[in-house]
């Protein structure tokens, strides 16, 4: 009976040791699976962050290019405004000159008429008599 009891205890210990080893293997398998899953998520997050960094850099470059283009447009617009102002100034100057020439022409015509009065109608053409 003692031998039988010792044998049963020994078998029970072997079964418990086997179950313990299986539990350890299962725990290691589970922890490996969890770590692999987490590593996959971390790798995905890292990849997403890299893509975001690339997009942010591209956005920054595009923004700088847009700012430069806008400055060029402003410079061109200012030049156009200045040219249009000069054209307006030339137009006003030419109208002033034209008006002055009309005044001079009218003054000369009146001076000529004052110095050379028109002939009476019957003396205008002596050959018609």
Swiss-Prot record:
Coiled-coil regions, chain positions: none
Keywords: Cytoplasm, Mitochondrion
GO biological process, one term: positive regulation of gut granule assembly
GO CC term, one of those recorded: mitochondrial intermembrane space
Subcellular location: Mitochondrion intermembrane space; Mitochondrion matrix; Cytoplasm, Cytosol
Domain of life: Eukaryota
InterPro entries per UniProt: BLOC1S1
Subunit structure: Component of the biogenesis of lysosome-related organelles complex-1 (BLOC-1) composed at least of blos-1, blos-2, blos-4, dsbn-1, glo-2, mutd-1 and snpn-1. Interacts with glo-2.
Known role: Component of the biogenesis of lysosome-related organelles complex-1 (BLOC-1), a complex involved in gut granule biogenesis. May negatively regulate aerobic respiration through mitochondrial protein lysine-acetylation.
Sequence similarity: Belongs to the BLOC1S1 family.
The protein's name: Biogenesis of lysosome-related organelles complex 1 subunit 1
Organism: Caenorhabditis elegans
Lineage: Eukaryota, Metazoa, Ecdysozoa, Nematoda, Chromadorea
Gene: blos-1
């Amino acid at each position: 009976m003692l031998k039988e009891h010792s044998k049963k205890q020994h078998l029970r210990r072997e079964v418990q040791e086997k179950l313990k080893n299986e539990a350890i293997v299962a725990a290691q398998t589970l922890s490996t699976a969890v770590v692999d899953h987490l590593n996959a998520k971390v790798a995905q997050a890292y990849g997403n962050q890299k893509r975001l960094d690339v997009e942010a850099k591209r956005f920054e470059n595009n923004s700088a290019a847009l700012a430069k283009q806008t400055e060029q447009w402003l410079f061109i617009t200012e030049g156009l405004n200045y040219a249009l102002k000069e054209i307006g100034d030339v137009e006003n100057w030419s109208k002033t000159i034209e008006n002055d020439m009309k005044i001079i022409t009218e003054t000369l015509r009146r001076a000529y008429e004052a110095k050379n009065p028109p002939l009476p109608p019957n003396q205008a053409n002596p050959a018609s008599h």
